[in-house]
């Protein structure tokens, strides 16, 4: 038979794959992409997103424990069966997780009010500490798996301030993390880089802020004049390129895992020992009782 060329591999492609061995690609060698949907116009939005090439969908809402999410998931299953992966959330307890898992969610997001630009707890008084919510939901996930044989991954959404918080969330049971402020700081973020008081910053705002006006994520109906903000419009300190920063963050996560004697996330969750610490313990965990050199720029050698 006549031989035909199947594909062409360029040096640049090989170098890119070698430099980024963990990249997630589809069968056409495109990056996997997720898209958010709401529980209002999903019947028009979801087909359009899938036609555009979205690989996974997630119902984007501040409150996932609702019949609206159940109806949205049911519609997706009716139209596409199990061929379309769709996550749901957000929830903060066992009941919320079990509700979405039984509804057919492929993964569940955990966290209400813990995001850096979210003020849902301040304005409505609902939410829960991220660690408490995550531990309870992950226990419910394991309970559901033992009872049904179906494993529904959990995403920790919110509360990540320092890199070690990523490792803590994974150790508490999260299968993966959602990061907003972390990525908003980088060149790749589509927002503007501006100078504020001599420091470069990147714009960052919540979907519930007046600027975004994404009331479909939060609104329960009623007159528009009754809508109120559940997010803020803010700046985050500019941090340079995504590649360099993610590499450092991943190195820190791996280093902590090694300290725990773990070579994988499941092993970390098995071996990590979580303990409650006091405020003084947190202070003593950093530098203290010294004057940092970078805080005293005008040093004269005597």
Residue ranges, per PLM feature:
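Long, charged amphipathic helices and adjacent flexible linkers at domain junctions
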Residues: 12-36, 76, 281-293, 297
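Active-site-adjacent beta->alpha loops and helix N-cap segments on the catalytic face
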Residues: 10-24, 41-45, 61-85, 91-99, ...
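Solvent-exposed alpha-helices and their adjacent loops that cap or buttress functional pockets
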Residues: 23-30, 49-51, 78-81, 99-102, ...
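Catalytic cores of alpha/beta
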Residues: 42-49, 92-110, 160-175
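Alpha/beta catalytic cores of nucleotide-metabolism and tRNA/nucleoside-modifying enzymes
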Residues: 36, 81, 125-156, 161-302
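Short, small-residue-biased leader/transition segments that mark boundaries at the very start
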Residues: 2-9
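Active-site beta->alpha loop and helix N-cap motifs at the rims of alpha/beta catalytic domains
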Residues: 30-50, 54-56, 63
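Hydrophobic faces of well-ordered beta-strands that scaffold small-molecule active sites
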Residues: 6, 31-37, 57-59, 86-89, ...
